[in-house]
């Protein structure tokens, strides 16, 4: 896998020698996270079959340039696909290109194909054939998440459409709403459509496409729905991918694959981002974000994976945070753990949150930063990333600061399953107390829609653990160190080492009960620790997917850096809308960057790609 930048868009080339190439077009929003790892496998499987395959992150998504508030984002997505096709032809020497779209990426690929010459084949995997249907699905997801987390914020406030990490201005939303494969004229020769088992039939669409003279193979792919599960449960639909390779057939006559891939770094408003490889045998992938307009401040920040999500994070929050830190003069590394995102697996398995490997991955990230920077190292983690940051800090004395966001577990017991833990995790005690007098809750209870037995058991268990936490010194005197005592001792050890901690929990996050069980009601013992800044963020969901929540997080981090590391804020933490930034597309610089081929690495000098300014 080789990282590249194409007109400001981050891409990964799975190189091969065939004359027929494939551009893989992913989905948007939360679906882009969940299906990311599967797309890596798709690219690898196509390359093994001889097809050079290019995964592209659209402009304003993933690790690409661009922001939510820029105009013409829909047009930018289509331009990203068009640029990827031209790049694959010019760089890899392919004579024909297949567009392979996943979910709403299928409709975007079809739209791009309607404008391109020489794209005569389309592969549509679990396709959402219209933007309107996709937006409706996102609204349902957003409402479900808001109900679960009791989070606040409008899905549509008259200016912005925001649904669990997908944030669109109205012109972009309207353009996406009008997208419909059935209304496009497609100058392609043939199409493979692999639908989900429970999808609404697209027989009418298939008939329309065949009326255009297109050879359409329309099949139900039994395993394609695995793409839509949460990233830690998402599975690679191997049968579907094998079907794609079989349908494509021969990759064509082999050509030379020792090509110069071009760009290695991305420059954005005095910020430079460079894909890097690190860890044992360079098996871990990351992006180093550096300020270029002034000297690098200390400290530096490491941002490990959250769950099995790729490094750009839910709502692209990690990218925004890294670039904001660079505006403060602070370098950062966001990285994928083993078996997550673009990183290779450590044991041949998919990335497993809360495994010991995650602790080692954090230390590998610290190795990388410590070898390049002299300042203090801060590790910023969310959920399982916070757990691994905490665990790594206990053993790695090079870690000087921790930013722990919605930490769910201080202790992970061997044999526990994340899926089981999530299914058996109930809401905070405070949530149930606040809703005890809510008539709607009682109506749901009478209809049997509330798991009253499970809730009662969870509350009773919490009460017992709260009492045990208060009585921990007496229990420890008789039975030896308890789990509560161990965690308290660990926090004390970090404090004695002067590890500065910012501990943030969303207002209804189950982590509130976790902290109460170890440090008393709402963590009162933790609040007394002089090395800990403890904050809650009312109205935010678990992943801080809302734009306002991410802005508030920036404010809290700015205060933490100012108070604990004497870092002066160079810009306002809540960044004003910067409409029109796309008027000048980013320049991609020539640098030496790692190139991955299996586990082997080599450094290659890459040529300059200088994008011309584009009108907004």
Which sequence ranges carry the predicted segments?
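Glycine-rich "HGGG/HGxG" loop immediately N-terminal to the catalytic nucleophile
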Residues: 57-72, 335-352
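N-terminal cap/lid segment of alpha/beta-hydrolase-fold proteins
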Residues: 1-17, 250-296, 546
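The alpha/beta-hydrolase serine catalytic core
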Residues: 3-6, 72, 116-241, 245, ...
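Short beta-to-alpha linker loops that shape the active-site pocket of alpha/beta-hydrolase fold enzymes
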Residues: 28, 52, 57-62, 128, ...
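Gly/Ala-rich beta-loop-alpha elbow adjacent to hydrolase catalytic centers
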Residues: 100-109, 380-389
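Short, surface-exposed "cap/lid" segments of acyl-processing enzymes
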Residues: 16-57, 292-334
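Alpha/beta-hydrolase active-site loop
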Residues: 70-90, 350-371
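Catalytic active-site module of serine/aspartate enzymes centered on a nucleophile-bearing elbow/loop
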Residues: 232-269, 540-543, 547-596, 601-616
